């Protein structure tokens, strides 16, 4: 505290007290930001730990998922512009001629004014892709072929499990691929 010069000032004690309060508020704001970043890191760690044991590159399975929430990010040009890409697991929605990114919410919905969308509950055909994203279409074909008699929807969901945040070599990336089976009512 002596180094800060706060107490060595010759100004009135009220001025020194005001500066001390301002410094305390600034430190508190920095602490809150650090805690927010730490929470984001812990969220990613938890998602990877929860997901990695289920990775099976050889087999495809049918899985029931509850409704899930995500924050839409947009296309590839918008991907790095906002915080959501960095703070939440990345999900990519592949349409026939589109590719939209989102941030999967794995815990409480954020308080900030983020737009929240829903991935519907349902039964999904699930497989995994290992490697660079440039080759993911091969895994899409393999999984669609496996589920060809299951009335699959057109949109393919790809959730990055092991990505550039934890692995430098893109040959080691791991992506969970989900294709929803259409409801037949």
Question: What is each stretch, according to the model?
Answer:
Residues 8-14, 18-185:
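A solvent-exposed interaction/effector surface
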